[in-house]
């Protein structure tokens, strides 16, 4: 039978992965280790070769071509060429001083007949005439010198490369290229109307070229831009070319960019707030002794404003290098004692892991040039009383440290759902006034910061400053770089699984019923099950091993191990009841072995449903000659697997395990008692009927409970409703009826070969339930 494959997967899964168990145990072992912090906090390699980063040099160089940049409207600096590369026709450049000079450039596409167009430029609606009968692009300059004039075309540039460049000289005059991009007709023209302080509007992507590199700009106009290469970091022009540029405290600067990756420098203002937490554990006895007062890691969430934007931030504070003190007044049970209490001293460090919801923390994996500046924080302890049963209460009070920023590294915070990038700020402690003491004891004038009440009267401590880092990130801003143990990889696997599930389910309509019954009767072994995927024996063995490891953790495998005898135990309890109504107390026995069935007033429904839920386990561990639901399930899996060309080794075990758990959820099982048949379903329905006439009779719960322990459990492939319908419409012999009740494969095959619509529809309904 095809379900033999499930037994083989189950029984072999406990002997194939001893080495994997050893590996898992080794991986789960936890050790306390000391990590020597290097330049990077994560031992991962970037997908490109990194150089030494920024190097100091006595020479100042300018890149001949910097960009491209997105469209911009600003008072661009003089003596630079701005090479525009528009992707659409329309206005690509405009400038005005709002008094004596208005100018804009319109890009006309090739083979454009003369027509009039309306454009919105510089807060004005303008009607112009355009014409370009040639096969090249045409940039046309439109100018007027009075607000009452109409725009007129002055000069144009014909180019095959859709490029035009603009420059403003020291006097404010605008220059651009005129003519055609052929060797003798390309020239630079200047409009002698100074606009030194006017805003220049560039409505297309543009690159920046120094005035000293005008020859290169001309070559670009003639021959087009070069292919994008991985550039060497020298001195990026960027917007640093603006002489009046003010460095913003919060900005993202693209340092270099290739096709898939770019380097971005993130500069951020930062406000770090943190809250110390502690453990105060009282020892047993009469109430005079404390076993531990210690610091513990604590998470704190807060919000603050950064450049008018609310930032949601998180911090985790922890300590290292604490000094442990103790105090004991004597050996008596009523002597006050603190076995251990933590104190931050000069040798101590405070670590604060910080992350927020800004863009900088989305791709903090491949990082260099990480630096930060933070102010000092002064922490002062409060009062903490020790409640003694009798006498005055000692009070620990005082203590102070000053936290001085000592460095920053990368760190990762792991939660149950995701791994988060973070920055770990390290603070060195320095003791300060006042000292701490415990009233009524000899503990006095000690310097440090005890863990008894580290927050004092403060809601939180706060450090302000800024950090900067250069991160290698994907060019696509919507993609987040996966980090160690990130959910991104699992999301990719889930996406593949969803696609495989969809394809797997869509194949149900292509299964021939006669082929399915024949396949269900074959004793499938592991090699024949997986050999259809790949042609090699080694691949089949690999797939079988992977499936075994996953299958041993399935619900079916767990049920076989722990619940095989559950039905027998419950049936024995019910069979001791004298009447049906007296079995109310025994219903709980059935309910105990089923975590699905709830208490119900209908005793028969409750017991029948509970039994049906467990019948699969008993049937699974028992051999019989009929067709079972698991035979059909395994046959469907095999049939669908044969239609796959290649299946991932990690996905296939998930698919087969899910199939064993989810295929055919609505099942019916029957027990035969001479001329009487008992049938129960997983939906809570129960039937009792005669084999001779299929007349329904009273369901005897006590007799049913007795049969559970001794009778063979049979999958009701053709359930009572279908058999009755078949008998009423076609008429069947007694022998056919008995064979149908026993799920005899020969009878099923004969009815299918006869194309009987009732039997065919029943099998098709079972196949449609084979979905994951």
Curated annotation (Swiss-Prot):
Residues 247-478 are annotated as: Spike body and stalk (antigen domain). Residues 65-225 are annotated as: Spike head. Pfam families: Rota_VP4_MID, VP4_haemagglut, VP4_helical. Residues 509-772 are annotated as: Spike foot. One of its GO terms (biological process) is virion attachment to host cell. In group A rotaviruses, VP4 defines the P serotype. The keyword Coiled coil applies. The keyword Cytoplasm does not apply. The record marks 245-246 as: Probable cleavage. Keywords: Capsid protein, Coiled coil, Hemagglutinin, Host cell membrane, Host cytoplasm, Host cytoskeleton, Host endoplasmic reticulum, Host membrane, Host-virus interaction, Membrane, Outer capsid protein, Viral attachment to host cell, Viral penetration into host cytoplasm, Viral penetration via permeabilization of host membrane, Virion, Virus entry into host cell. The record marks 232-233, 242-243 as: Cleavage. The lineage of its organism: Viruses, Riboviria, Orthornavirae, Duplornaviricota, Resentoviricetes. InterPro entries: ConA-like_dom_sf, Rota_A_VP4, Rota_VP4_MID, Rota_VP4_MID_sf, VP4_concanavalin-like, VP4_helical. This is Outer capsid protein VP4.
């Amino acid at each position: 039978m095809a379900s033999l494959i499930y037994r083989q997967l189950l029984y072999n899964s406990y002997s194939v992965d001893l080495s994997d168990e050893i590996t898992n145990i080794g991986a789960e072992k936890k050790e306390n280790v000391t990590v020597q912090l290097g330049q990077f906090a994560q031992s991962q390699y970037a997908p490109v070769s990194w150089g030494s980063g920024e190097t100091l040099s006595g020479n100042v160089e300018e890149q001949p071509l910097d960009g491209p940049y997105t469209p911009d409207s600003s008072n661009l600096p003089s003596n630079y060429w701005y090479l525009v590369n528009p992707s659409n026709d329309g206005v690509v450049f405009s400038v005005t001083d709002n008094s004596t000079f208005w100018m804009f450039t319109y890009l006309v596409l090739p083979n454009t007949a003369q027509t009039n167009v309306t454009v919105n430029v510089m807060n004005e609606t303008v009607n112009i005439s355009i014409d370009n009968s040639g096969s090249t692009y045409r940039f046309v300059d439109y100018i007027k010198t009075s607000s009452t004039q109409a725009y007129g075309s002055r000069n144009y540039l014909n180019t095959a490369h859709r490029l035009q460049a603009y420059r403003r000289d020291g006097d404010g005059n605008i220059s651009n290229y005129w003519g055609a991009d052929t060797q003798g007709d390309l020239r630079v023209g200047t409009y002698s109307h100074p606009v030194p302080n006017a805003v220049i509007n560039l409505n297309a992507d543009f690159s920046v070229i120094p005035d000293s590199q005008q020859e290169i700009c001309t070559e670009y106009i003639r021959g087009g831009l070069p292919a994008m290469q991985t550039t060497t970091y020298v001195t990026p022009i960027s917007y640093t070319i603006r002489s009046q540029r003010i460095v913003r405290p919060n900005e993202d600067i693209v340092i270099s960019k290739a096709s898939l990756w770019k380097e971005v420098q993130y500069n951020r203002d930062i406000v770090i707030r943190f809250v110390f937490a502690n453990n105060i554990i009282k020892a047993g006895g009469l109430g005079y002794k404390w076993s531990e007062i210690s610091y513990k890691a604590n998470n704190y969430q807060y919000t603050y404003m950064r450049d008018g934007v609310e930032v949601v931030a998180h911090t985790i504070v922890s300590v290292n290098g604490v000094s442990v003190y103790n105090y004991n007044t004597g050996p008596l049970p009523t002597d006050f004692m603190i076995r251990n209490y933590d104190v931050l001293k000069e040798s101590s460090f405070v670590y604060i892991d910080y992350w927020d919801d800004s863009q900088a923390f989305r791709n903090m994996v491949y990082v260099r040039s990480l630096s930060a500046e933070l102010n000092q924080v002064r922490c002062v302890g409060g009062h903490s009383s020790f409640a003694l049963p009798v006498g005055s209460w000692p009070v620990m009070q005082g203590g102070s440290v000053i936290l001085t920023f000592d460095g920053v590294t990368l760190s990762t915070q792991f939660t149950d759902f995701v791994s988060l990038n973070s920055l770990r700020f390290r603070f060195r402690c320095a003791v300060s006034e006042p000292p701490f003491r415990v009233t009524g004891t000899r503990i006095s004038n000690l310097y440090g910061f005890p863990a008894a009440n580290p927050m004092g009267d403060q809601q939180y401590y706060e450090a302000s400053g800024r950090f900067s880092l250069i991160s290698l990130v994907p060019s696509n801003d919507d993609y987040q770089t996966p980090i160690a143990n990130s959910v991104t990889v699992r999301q990719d696997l889930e996406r593949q699984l969803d696609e495989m599930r969809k394809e797997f389910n869509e194949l149900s309509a292509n299964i021939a019923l006669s082929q399915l019954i024949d396949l269900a009767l074959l004793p499938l072994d592991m090699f024949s099950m997986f050999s259809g995927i790949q042609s090699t024996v080694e691949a089949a063995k690999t797939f079988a091993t992977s499936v075994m490891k996953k299958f041993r953790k399935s619900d079916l495998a767990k049920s076989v191990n722990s619940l095989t005898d559950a039905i027998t135990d419950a049936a024995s309890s019910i069979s001791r009841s004298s009447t049906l109504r007296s079995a109310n107390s025994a219903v709980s026995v059935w309910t105990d072995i089923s975590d699905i069935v709830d208490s119900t007033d209908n005793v028969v429904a409750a017991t029948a449903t509970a039994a049906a839920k467990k019948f699969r386990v008993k049937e699974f561990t028992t051999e019989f000659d009929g067709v079972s639901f698991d035979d059909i399930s395994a046959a469907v899996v095999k049939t669908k697997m044969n239609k796959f060309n290649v299946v991932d080794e990690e996905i296939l075990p998930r698919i087969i395990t899910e199939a064993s758990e989810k295929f055919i959820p609505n099942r019916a099982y029957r027990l035969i008692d001479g001329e009487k048949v008992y049938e129960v379903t997983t939906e809570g329905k129960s039937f009792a009927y005669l084999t001779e006439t299929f007349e329904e009779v009273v369901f005897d719960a006590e007799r049913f409970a007795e049969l559970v322990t001794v009778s063979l459990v049979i999958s009701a492939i053709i359930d009572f409703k279908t058999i009755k319908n078949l008998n009423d419409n076609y008429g069947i012999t007694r022998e056919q009826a008995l064979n149908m009740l026993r799920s005899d494969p020969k009878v099923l095959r004969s009815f299918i070969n006869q194309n009987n619509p009732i039997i065919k529809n029943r099998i098709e309904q079972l196949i449609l339930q084979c979905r994951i």
